[in-house]
Amino acid sequence: MRVDLRPVTLDDISILRTWDSEPDRDEWAGTDGPWEWEAEIPIDEPWKTMWIAERGGLAIGFVQLLETSLDETNYWGEDAEKGTWAIDLWIGDPVHRGGGIGSQIMSRAIEILDECGASRVLVDPLIANRRAHAFYEACGFAPIGERSFGADRCLVFERRLDQ
């Protein structure tokens, strides 16, 4: 069954909070704590889009696309060059993980970024999240180095879209 992406709305806060409180959350999302969805969702900026992944009308995941050079938080620092975007991708309920849904979501996210003219895409899974490392490599990303983001130690991966 096909996975579709639709823009996040305030109506999604309940499911996002549920996913954000999963017992294994810190293993894949880091130690920064839950997102402030009420503040994040209404922000309408061309450099950041947030999507809900659905399969058969059921919300199963979340993806955020962020143009690093325009991100006001400067999260990506020196990696924030024009044309570089970052992806945050979650599969919410653990029952949906490991069945190819993430690959479908990533393919759709890459299509969107290609349409936006992105030349490079970054992801930042935690160092200990070996499952995510294998996933990103299978999706065409290559590791480019370790980096600390707040208290979290991550392995940054990139995928070039301009080659």
Residue positions per predicted region:
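Conserved acetyl-CoA-binding loop-helix of GNAT-fold acetyltransferases
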Residues: G92, G98-E111, A134-A138
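Conserved GNAT acetyl-CoA-binding A-motif
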Residues: L113-P125
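Conserved beta-strand-loop-alpha-helix junction that forms the acyl-donor binding cleft
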Residues: V123-H133, F149-R153
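A short, well-structured alpha-helix characteristic of acyl/acetyltransferase catalytic modules
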Residues: M1-I41, I60, Q163
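Short hydrophobic/aromatic beta-strand or adjacent loop that forms the aromatic wall/cage
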Residues: K48, D152-V156
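Acetyl-CoA-dependent GNAT
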Residues: T31-H96, I112, R160-Q163
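Conserved acetyl-CoA-binding loop of GNAT-fold acetyltransferases
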Residues: E137-G145
